[in-house]
Amino acid sequence: MSKEFIRVVGARQHNLKNLSLEIPRDRLVVITGPSGSGKSSLAFDTLFAEGQRKYVESLSAYARQFLDQMQKPEVDHIEGLSPAIAIEQRTSGANPRSTIATTTEIYDYLRLLYAHLGQPHDPETGTPMACQSATEIVDRIALLPTKTRLMVLAPVVEDQRGEFRDVLERLQREGFVRVRVDGQIQELNPKEPIRLDAKATHTVEVVVDRIVIAEGVRVRLADSVETALRWGEGRLKVLHQAPDRPTDPWTETLHSTRMYSPATGRSFDTPTPQHFSFNSPKGACPVCHGLGQKMVFDPSLIVPDETKTLEDGAVQPYRRMGGKKMVSYYKGLIKGVAQHCGAPLDRPWKELSEEARRTLMHGSGTDEVDFWFMSGGAPKKTRKPFEGVLPNLERLYADSESEFTRNRLKAYMTLHPCDACRGRRLRPEMLAVTLGSEALAGSKVPGRSIADFCSLSIAEAHVFLGGFVLSDLQRRIAGEVILEIRKRLGFMVEVGLGYLTLDRESGSLSGGEAQRIRLATQIGAGLVGVLYILDEPSIGLHQRDNDRLLETVRRLRDAGNSVIVVEHDEDTIRAADHVLDIGPGAGIHGGELVAQGTPAEIMASARSVTGRYLSGDLCIPVPRHRVDPREDKGWIEIIGATENNLRNVDARIPLGTLTCVTGVSGSGKSTLIDDILRRTVFRQWYGSKERPGAHREIRNLELLEKCIVIDQAAIGRTPRSNPATYTGMFNEIRDLFASVATARVRGYDAGRFSFNVKGGRCEKCEGDGVLKIEMHFLPPVYVTCEACAGKRYNRETLEITYKGLNIADILQLTVDEAVNFFRAVPKLHAPSLTLAEVGLGYLRLGQSATTLSGGEAQRLKLAAELSRRQTGRVLYLLDEPTTGLHFQDIAKLLEVLFKLRDGGNTLVVIEHNLDVIKTADWVIDLGPEGGSGGGQIIAQGTPETVAATPGSHTGRYLTRVLRQKPSPTSRSNRG
């Protein structure tokens, strides 16, 4: 076995054509080639899958049953393979409890740090807290007035499930006669033992003593306190009742030998790491349970259309709740309140007075309102205060036991920061434990809480800990912890993530950001001898930050690892030790090793399209003319954008043009376009529940008809989804087969030719074409269905043919073949031709959507848009459409974008790729830096204007590519 190479023999996974090659070990190897050529099939579906499979096979059969096992890839054999770790572009899921701090395990170290070095404060007054001794506790209790009745309790069980029979029996044996169980005092009687529900949570506190404050009671009190502290493990509770007030409720006070506030007399548990976890009941905010947000009724969803009147049903929920009687009842409510406020029923909501709208939404308080309701066929007057629409809906939601009703009410709710913890997830006493001495604005407590620390950007947190001065004792306690946190923060700064905040939810990260976080985590792990496989780590990264990313990847290699990167970025390819160029085309036209060697050897290869782009022989040209923004066409104007780090930004987007929004990572691009523009449009036009980002207004949206977001998400999540179903061609194909004479004679309709429903499909495989066989300790095996031979349909359905082909044959046609085959059927020829024009001619009509790359899925969506009748008033939003695209694919993508633009539509593209930016008609460059250093518009104008702007990082790199001479034959030269 070679120690210098990974030797792959006979790789046939997906479209790989019996590929055999040697990949040098302990090197930085870049796999490149057109989208769909087989790069991921080689890197992830062959190399990683086999490395993972061999590792899992080394485990016991018992362990294997708990793991997701990968199928053996279609390859003869692989030699010299190390344990493999894949760092892909997948996001981290939508779990709201997962943040950057928890994902990177920084939060675990922070919990240790705050538990050992944090200074506790009283959450009410901000005064530092100190520990109480047993004597001090006795002194505090003895200050109660003479004749005060009190009980000393020791908590022995807190919020735990179980019967606790042994605990109660032990207390009885020790001589105790009373306990408080779930707030109720009960006697310990052996004849009538206390029985608890084993499935419910309980709190059990033993009554150590019952005392009346008087002279000479101190010795007994001290003895009781010591006993209670021993049983309560350092904690006790005192219930006392004022003298001569036997009917007053008992006042409860917690005392602890750990933390005590002299200002308020309150005691708290000594903080432990668990107290700083928002996933633990000990630390989580009791209102939002550690989520930091909760569902609340949103006035903008309750009154979605402010041009409607009360008479016409401006208050949306009251139009749809219950039957006719309830609708009539709510009409009576609204009418009564409107008359009380002097609000005309026929006036639009937005024209009502502020006072009238406030009363309708929040209630009349103590003021009584006259209501008239029908009772027994006659109107009946009722006088009472009006609780308000919002309190009424909140009460209905809280009281309803009907899941249907609650789901219906959820349509009017959105997520808002929790009022109790202000979105910080933890209990007040844990938020009052701080590090440092600098007082933050609006806080009673000096220093930073763990939530304040997590609200810092990664770069700011790195600086904060760097300036943290430790005493010798503190250094011995937490020096290693701080070093580990700083190391992880430093790695993330190095891969260009310094602008992200530690409390950012993992689900909100882009694929590139999530991947770079995992990359930083792997560097911190310090593993050696591993095969790392990375999927386009440069995605979402500005050119300025590329060098730091490459240095990080080199560090992985220099530690003694083999690093394979699937990448299209020119700088990354040039930095590689070895390049594998897969191609020459995509799909059935790819799967071959076109060239391999150093970047210089790739550039010298006549067969390599990648090499020709690297050498400058081919390039995406600068357009000779651009579409000039015209005032008569109009502009979308975003005024006063202040969401996240945006600093009162005013942005103008010319209609009918291709606009690129650029800037370093974290400068505010996605906030401006996605959080503000898209969310505002989707809420106004489509009733979306997503809250738009903060801004004053967006002008001229009425000049557009609709908004479409085109991303690289899969077009379907099941193998049944394919290009024919997505583009709508399959409906036309089924109608075509149903119109064949034989089908009409047999009475077959279009449904007969669907593989999703009973009738025409093969029932043995239920239209899948394959059968899944579970192998228990091995991964499941998929075998071709014997009944239909993988064709999905039953024999009778396959007997129906059109021009000699049955429905299964049609689904096996490539797009290029379909263009010719359906030349006489306009409804099928046109979409086939569009798919071919966007470079997808190699796809099969019935190819499973799950096998498509991100670039292929995106071009499929663009083709579907091109196939529709163009109205010229559509706003298209694209976020980094060049993800996963080769130079050649970017040229094809631009052709499609130009077609959409030439149809009069408006395209807004968030992009880092300079080839796309240089061909744009208009550029909005944000910056100058990321995070708190960004949020400003550095330049707006043509690419040439941005390139000439001092202080623009984008402009600096744009200058170089704008010098490339335009090609006279390039279609991108059209204005």
Regions found by a protein language model. Name each.
Residues 1-975:
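Conserved phosphate-binding elements of NTP-dependent enzyme cores
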